[in-house]
Amino acid sequence: MTISTVCGFLPQIAISLFAGVWIDRYDRKKMIMLSDGVIAIATLVLASLFLTGYKSIWLLFIVLLIRSAGTGVQTPAVNALIPQIVPKEYLMKVNGINSSITSLIMFLSPAASAAILSIASIETTFFIDVITAMFGISIMFVIQVEGHVNVESKQKSNLQGIKEGFSYLKENVFIKRLILLLIIVMILISPAAFLTPLMVTRSFGAEMWRLTASEMTFSAGAAAGGVLIAAWGGFPNRMHTTALACALYGLLMIGLGIAPIFTMYLVFNFLIGITMPCFNTPVTVLLQEKVEPSMHGRMFSLVQIANSCALPLGMIIFGPLSDMFSVEVLLIYAGIFVLFCAMYVVLSKRFEV
């Protein structure tokens, strides 16, 4: 489990800094297609080796490394590409829909995988993954995107490009504070993200259906939240939307901590799922609006690194504490601090857009 976690996070973090430079330097559409294609080829090789009888856990780890690296390129590339093809007034709607689709996939994937594995081999699931990837690449191929090639950036080394990104972040105080807020909140919500299965087992029972229900209610809520933010569009001031979602998240974390019965816990978990895209989507749109297009790749790569590091860092803090205190206590106190973050955003003038 530890090795798979490292394989899933480390390459994504390691490649993101360089990926940001590449995304700002080359055609973003091609970067997305290339990363998806590399992942598909790695999965195809894995499926072929499994079919020949060569089945090794290390093969899975290697492919997981490649998939993680591909995600480290693809995710910031998608966020950087969206402003190129979407009018500014529709950014919130499109990013909300994108968030909803991602959450819906998370919601449906476990059930779909279980259904496929009940009637077919694991190799079949690998081939299905390759086919869906090729389908996605084909859709991306036909989308018309204005060429984005930064000739000036091509003349500089990757390290110079990374240095430029950090210099840009240092000079833009609002963006720096926004990313710092994201890191702090992600650390604080890590108990709700990772420790709730432990809470369910300790407080409500270790039956598998309870753990499944816990995961599915959050994913369903996140899908609904993406639809909500896409339809609503948020407040005219993006930071007010983020602050409201942050405050609700904190209150709902406290609700999780005091929920007396499992049904109430599931309701709070579903509502937390709704607040997540309402917090993340305005932040993404703000970066798309406020950051120079030539820096989109590098800034979104820094956000990717922040997200990838913050949750594990939170678990380094809250994991050992869960052996000393109940998860409920951790959720309540972390939720209070999340509320303080929301209050600071509203009351402080440091986040004025």
Give residue spans per PLM region:
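Transmembrane alpha-helical segments that form the membrane-embedded catalytic/substrate-channel core
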Residues: 69, 136-137, 342
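Juxtamembrane intracellular "pre-TM" segments in multi-pass secondary transporters
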Residues: 145-180
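Helix-interface capping motifs at the ends of transmembrane segments in multi-pass membrane proteins
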Residues: 48-55, 264
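C-terminal transmembrane bundle of multi-pass solute transporters/carriers
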Residues: 4, 25, 31, 45, ...
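Substrate-agnostic recognition of the 12-TM MFS/MFS-like secondary transporter fold
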Residues: 2-23, 27-42, 59-117, 128, ...
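Generic alpha-helical segment signature
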Residues: 75, 155-159, 244
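Helix-loop junctions on the cytosolic side of multi-pass membrane transporters
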Residues: 80, 84, 126-156, 346-353
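Membrane-water interface of transmembrane alpha-helices in multipass transporters/channels
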Residues: 54, 58, 125-130, 208-210
